Design a protein with these regions (language model features):
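Canonical tetratricopeptide repeat
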Residues: 90, 184-191, 222-225, 256, ...
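TPR alpha-solenoid repeat register
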Residues: 87, 132, 180-181, 185, ...
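Canonical positions in the second alpha-helix
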Residues: 75, 122, 171, 208-209, ...
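Structural marker of alpha-solenoid helical repeat scaffolds
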Residues: 78, 125, 174-178, 212, ...
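N-terminal leader/linker segments that initiate helical-solenoid repeat arrays
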Residues: 19-136, 140-143, 158
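Residue-level recognition of tetratricopeptide repeat
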Residues: 82-84, 129, 178, 182, ...
């Protein structure tokens, strides 16, 4: 009889524990609801320019959110409720609010990352639950992505390029939760990586983009720049050639190819391309200047003084104030006189 009684007591105890954790989840929901009410009131007061009262309402919202966070943290760490999608649904709502409003940032500095993780867990734990709430959850995912974009822009403007890159990668990975590929986010990350000389990261990002089927002139350009910076010259040339095959008229790729071949002292392979660009861009003297530099270089297999002078004269026709063209012409005549 004692064993039966003990079993009944244990079952009752376990039931009470389970109810307690469910209660914490309900508490979190209610505290968050109260916080949202305070936020809405604060926003209305701000429209009326009643900033002091708005600040008080936001402080009340912060208190409610702090309680909501404490309650949902308990539910998220309990063996029974942590395996339920609803727990992580509430968790994501609360933490997204903390991440979105600067007034609540000190409640958790990693709130945005935790929101993304919670949204990911919803799908992992219960795909049917996600489908039932797909509209709402997709909105949260979009909000997280937007937050990452905003954080990335702020980090970039402040010169923290590594953080900016991470933010845009996080934006991409957040959209991937629902099977979407935000390749524009990775493109921004790749561009910043090239600018910041984070060349291995740039190569990794461009590889992902190409694997995703996202082929643009910029992807090939960034890949080539990063490979060249690491002295992977064969890879640099390979990606430039692939890019030119797919986008033969893209001037940025053409210019990158010209720079690459000049760097490798393979100007004979690119001279026709440079001349074509010079004839095409009749108001831009830079291509004739490059031609003049190549033809005027005694170490080049294309060394030709008359062609060099002709090209520099073309530069002066287009831009009479180009001092370097005059200097180089003078240098050629000095060399000839010696």
């Amino acid at each position: 009889m004692k064993k039966v009684t003990f079993l009944v007591v244990m079952l009752a105890f376990l039931a009470n524990v389970s109810m307690a954790q469910n209660k914490e989840r309900v508490n979190a929901f209610n505290y968050n609801k109260n916080a949202q009410s305070y936020i809405q009131t604060a926003e209305q007061l701000m429209v009326q320019n009643r900033t002091d009262k708005a600040a008080k309402e936001m402080n009340n919202a912060k208190i409610m959110l702090q309680r909501a966070k404490a309650a949902i943290d308990l539910a998220a760490n309990h063996e029974e409720t942590k395996v339920e999608a609803k727990t992580w649904h509430y968790y994501s709502v609360i933490y997204l609010k903390i991440a979105t409003y600067p007034e609540f940032a000190e409640l958790d500095t990693e709130a945005l990352e935790k929101t993304a993780d919670a949204l990911r867990k919803i799908i992992e734990l219960d795909e049917s639950y996600f489908k039932q709430n797909a509209g709402e959850i997709s909105t949260y995912i979009q909000s997280v992505t937007t937050n990452y974009f905003n954080q990335g822009a702020v980090a970039y403007e402040s010169g923290d390029y590594v953080k900016a890159i991470d933010c845009y990668i996080n934006a991409y990975e957040t959209m991937a939760i629902v099977g979407q590929k935000d390749n524009e986010a990775l493109m921004v990350a790749a561009q910043i990586a090239v600018m910041a000389n984070e060349n291995n990261k740039a190569i990794e990002l461009c590889t992902t983009l190409l694997n995703d089927g996202f082929e643009t002139p910029q992807v090939y350009q960034y890949m080539a720049i990063a490979q060249g910076a690491l002295e992977n010259n064969d890879a640099m040339v390979e990606y430039l050639q692939k890019g030119r095959e797919k986008f033969p008229e893209d001037e940025a790729l053409i210019n990158e190819q010209i720079n690459a071949y000049l760097k490798l002292k393979r100007e004979a392979e690119i001279i026709d391309q440079i001349r074509e660009m010079a004839e095409k861009n009749t108001t831009n003297s830079v291509y004739y200047f490059i031609l003049g530099t190549i033809y005027g270089n005694p170490e080049s297999e294309l060394y030709n003084v008359d062609e060099a002078l002709n090209c520099y004269n073309k530069v002066i026709e287009i831009n009479p104030n180009d001092e370097n063209a005059y200097i180089n012409i003078a240098g050629i005549y000095i060399d000839k006189s010696n």
